[in-house]
Amino acid sequence: DNDKQGDHGSHVTGIAAGNRYIEQADGSFAPALDTALTQGVAPDAQVYTMKVFGKGGGAYDSDYMAAIEDAMILGCDSANLSLGSGNPGYSRQSDAKYQAILEAVVNSGMVVAMSAGNSGHWFENTPYAYPYAESVSWASNGSPGSYTNSLGIASVDNVGSTGNYIEFAGTKMFYNDTSEAPIQPMTALAGEQRFVYVDAVGNPEDFAAAGDELKGAIAMCNRGSINFTAKGNNAVAAGAIGTIVVNNAAGTINMSTDGYTGTAPYVSLTLADGQIIKANAEKKEANGVTYYVGKLTVGAKPGVNVQTADYYTMSDFSSWGIPGSLELKPEITAPGGNIYSLQNGGGYQNMSGTS
């Protein structure tokens, strides 16, 4: 995957078929689970990639239906569709030709897994007029995952965390890094570092309130009001050696760093991690701005944190059933929130979705 449009495809492919062994710098091979902390569910499986989206995004049903048919003809054991309509989907495809393809898939024995969608709860979509006016259903799962002959997949959050992290107050906090070269990875700052967490959105005056304390430290600020590029540029201009944006809602952030002029590391943390930092750091105030200072440790390599839980919790983005046919949809729920897998350029990252 050498395009610049994102690395969702690489991430999903790594989950499905990531290699069992990875070549090392000396030419030897080592187990992926030991060196990269991840491998595919079906490691080393052959993967066919079928492009159905245009450069500007969006896919026609004729394109992905043709891809399903091609996969069946080629003898694929399974197919994955990381796509779906934003509005609640119907139970059957209205086009007889498409319905025939779906029925042929069932008879062929090929398993076709389709995302139930990332539309979340029904009420989250009402401002966008996605639910049909005449509908009394609270379903939000889109087509083709809503079709009778599809296998719709919903998402639960991972009970553990894998990836690069910072550590503070005895807690490993796994950050999300969506930046690319020439921006340095956060691991370039491995070891103990000072931080200044400005409890504001990252305007120039927000960082200025911390004065010289920010110089040579990692800057932290909250998501909101201004774009991610401005936050990072403002932090670097104030003397920060790296920037961390804390989410203002549950979940992770897939930040766009287009326009970021610095090379200093730029990553994001969850709201929950930000709250832990504020609760355990030294609190200060200047010019009407509250900020927190302390020292954290940047991990030099990926780590694992397995949390104790009696059960999984549904991902807040996962679409809900049930379609108009009253069939059990989606059929399967599996971990899709905060999954560690491939990133473009030979790296690894956490991403979330129902794919």
Protein language model annotation of sequence segments:
Residues 1-60, 74-77, 107-109, 146-150, ...:
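Subtilisin-like serine protease catalytic core
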